[in-house]
């Protein structure tokens, strides 16, 4: 006998969304919203833009590796989620102090190109978008790693949406974060 829960995306207090499998789906949703805004505003870009969503990030970045090899980008801005460390059982000394509702998290780390990160920070400051900074001492654990080390190296950056209760059926994200994330992109 197999028992499953019937679930759906729910809104909490008009501030948060909660549901299952928001990890990675939120990144895909955000980039889809960016494309929608570009289309609605009839925005013409001075460069080619590939908007992709990958598979198998949790088990080895396989989709991102294939995409990076196929399109050979000059720049990659990856959207994903990160742990809200204000949830129970997080050691902020190890994981940093990242909180849902306080802005998207921009990551420093070996896979992140400093000039691209500086551009994201300056853009957020100019547009008065709140953000948080986090560090990755080795791997980011996201598709950023696949892009950064592909081909001959790709300038990469990571914008993460803080998510409570990752890898559970009640993953929770801030609605205002989601909109700020889209605006920064």
Indicate residue ranges for each PLM-predicted region.
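Flexible, glycine/charged-enriched surface loops at secondary-structure junctions
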Residues: 41-49, 128-137, 185
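Short glycine-rich, acidic/polar surface loops and turns
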Residues: 138-158
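Conserved small/polar residues in nucleotide/adenosyl-binding loops
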Residues: 176-183
């Amino acid at each position: 006998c197999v028992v499953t829960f019937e679930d759906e995306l729910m809104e909490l207090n008009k501030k948060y969304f909660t549901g299952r499998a928001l990890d990675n789906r939120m990144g895909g949703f955000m980039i889809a919203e960016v494309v929608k805004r570009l289309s609605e505003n009839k925005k013409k870009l001075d460069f080619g833009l590939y908007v992709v969503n990958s598979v198998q990030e949790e088990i080895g970045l396989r989709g991102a590796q294939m995409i990076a090899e196929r399109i050979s980008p000059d720049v990659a801005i990856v959207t994903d989620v990160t742990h809200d460390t204000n949830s129970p059982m997080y050691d902020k000394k190890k994981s940093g102090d990242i909180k849902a509702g306080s802005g998207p998290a921009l990551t420093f780390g070996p896979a992140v190109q400093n000039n691209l990160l500086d551009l994201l920070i300056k853009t957020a400051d100019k547009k008065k978008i709140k953000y948080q900074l986090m560090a990755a001492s080795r791997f980011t654990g996201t598709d950023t790693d696949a892009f950064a080390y592909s081909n001959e190296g790709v300038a990469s950056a990571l914008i993460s949406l803080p998510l409570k209760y990752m890898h559970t059926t009640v993953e929770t994200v801030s609605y205002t974060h989601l909109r700020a994330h889209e605006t920064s992109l």
